C-alpha cells in the first residue's frame, strides 16, 4: 500500500555515523523482506528460496537480523524493531490482491522448477516470500537474546514508529 509523502515530508539523507548514540526505529517487516528476497539460493540449479538449515527451515531472516543488528550495535546505534500487528480492515483488498499475486507466482515457480528453468524459478521465488508468524517469533526471540528491544504495533508498524518518534525521541527509519 504505502503513501507518497515526499511533497509534505521530503526524505533526508543521513549517515549511519550520525546515528551513533541514538535510538532508531526500524520497520521489522520491511527489513525481514529485504533478507528473505536477497539471501536466497541462487546457485545454478537453485530454487531461489531463502537460505535454509539442515531441516529445511528458512534462516535468511535470522542471519540478516543477526548481522545487521550486530553492525548497528557496533556503530553505537540503538535499534528498536517495530513489527506490524493486525492489518487494518481498510487494507483488506490490498492484502487479498497480494495473496492472489503470491499464489500466481507460486504456480509459475513450481512450473519453472519442473521445466528446469531455474532463472525463472529464482525470479518467481522473490515474489512468493512470506514472513510467517513462526519466523516473526524466531526473530523476536533472537532480538531478545541480543538484548535489543522490539514492539508489536496494534496495526501498521510505520504508524507505531511515527508515534514513538514523536513521543520518545526515537528516530524512525
Task: Give the residues covered by each predicted segment.
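Noncatalytic, basic helical substrate-engagement surface that gates or grips nucleic-acid strands
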Residues: 3-8, 19-156, 160-164
Amino acid at each position: 500500500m504505502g503513501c507518497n509523502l515526499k511533497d509534505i515530508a521530503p526524505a533526508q539523507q543521513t549517515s549511519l555515523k550520525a546515528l551513533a548514540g541514538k535510538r532508531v526505529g526500524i520497520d521489522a517487516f520491511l527489513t525481514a523482506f529485504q533478507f528473505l528476497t536477497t539471501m536466497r539460493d541462487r546457485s545454478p540449479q537453485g530454487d531461489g528460496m531463502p537460505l535454509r538449515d539442515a531441516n529445511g527451515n528458512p534462516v535468511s531472516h535470522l542471519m540478516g537480523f543477526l548481522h545487521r543488528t550486530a553492525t548497528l550495535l557496533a556503530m553505537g546505534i540503538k535499534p528498536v524493531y517495530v513489527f506490524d500487528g493486525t492489518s487494518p480492515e481498510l487494507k483488506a483488498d490490498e492484502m487479498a490482491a497480494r495473496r492472489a499475486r503470491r499464489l500466481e507466482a507460486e504456480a509459475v515457480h513450481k512450473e519453472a522448477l519442473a521445466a528446469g528453468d531455474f532463472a525463472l524459478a529464482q525470479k518467481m521465488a522473490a515474489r512468493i516470500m512470506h514472513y510467517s508468524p513462526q519466523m516473526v517469533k524466531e526473530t523476536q526471540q533472537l532480538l531478545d537474546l541480543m538484548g535489543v528491544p522490539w514492539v508489536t504495533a496494534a496495526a501498521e508498524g510505520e504508524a507505531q514508529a511515527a508515534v514513538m518518534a514523536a513521543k520518545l525521541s526515537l528516530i524512525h527509519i
